[in-house]
Amino acid sequence: FNINAILTGLLSVPLIIFYPYMKRYTHWPQLCLGLVFNWGVLIVSIEFFNEINLYFFLLYFACIFWTLAYDTIYAYQDREDDLENNIKSTAVLFGALGHKFVMTFYTIFFLIIGFLGYKSSGNLLSFATIFLFIFAMILYLNKWRLDSKNSSNYYFKFNNIIGLFCFFFLLIF
C-alpha cells in the first residue's frame, strides 16, 4: 500500500462529509460532487507516480467539468421541487440558461480531454475528433428540454455513451 495514496484518499473525507449538506448552503453542490467523485484520479496519480502529475491533475479538472455538466442535467429533473423547497442547485441557479452552462462545461471537459490525447500521442487527429464530438453534442443537446423530467433523465443517461467515448479516446490516443 502506498501511504501517500491512502493519505490523499483521506483528504477527501471532509468533502464527502459536507457534500450531502451543500444544497442547503450553495447553488454549486454539483461542483462539490465533482471534487469528491473524481478524487480517485488524484489517488491513482499518487499510487503510480508518487505525485499528482500535470496529466492527472488536468484529467481530474476535466472530470470535474464533466460532473458539473451531467449532474446539472440531472438536477433539472428536480428543479421545480427544489424551488418549492428552497433547495439550491446549479439547475435552480441557471434557470433557462441551462443549455449554455451545460454546453460550456462539456466543451471545457472535451477540450481538456482532447489536449491530453494530443499530449499523449502527438496526433492532431485527437483534437479533430474532439471538435467533431463537441459539435455533435451541441446539436444533440439542443433537443434537451429543460422543463421535462423525461428529457433531463434521457440526456443524463447519455453520459454513459460519453464516458465510453472518452475511455476509448484516451485508450487510442
Language model regions located:
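Alpha-helical transmembrane segments of multi-pass membrane proteins
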Residues: I16-P20, A62-T67, Y74, L132-L139
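Residue-level signal for inorganic ion chemistry
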Residues: P29, D78, N159
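Residue-level recognition of pore/gate-forming positions within transmembrane alpha-helices
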Residues: V13-I16, F37-N38, C63, Y106-F110, ...
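Alpha-helical transmembrane segments
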Residues: Y55-W66, G122-T129
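Intramembrane alpha-helical segments
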Residues: F1-L58, F115, I138-R145, N150
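Solvent-exposed interhelical
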Residues: I64-I112, K143-W144, N150-F156
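Small-residue-rich segments of transmembrane alpha-helices in multi-pass membrane proteins
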Residues: C32-I46, L93, F156-L170
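Extended hydrophobic alpha-helices typical of membrane-associated regions
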Residues: F115-F173
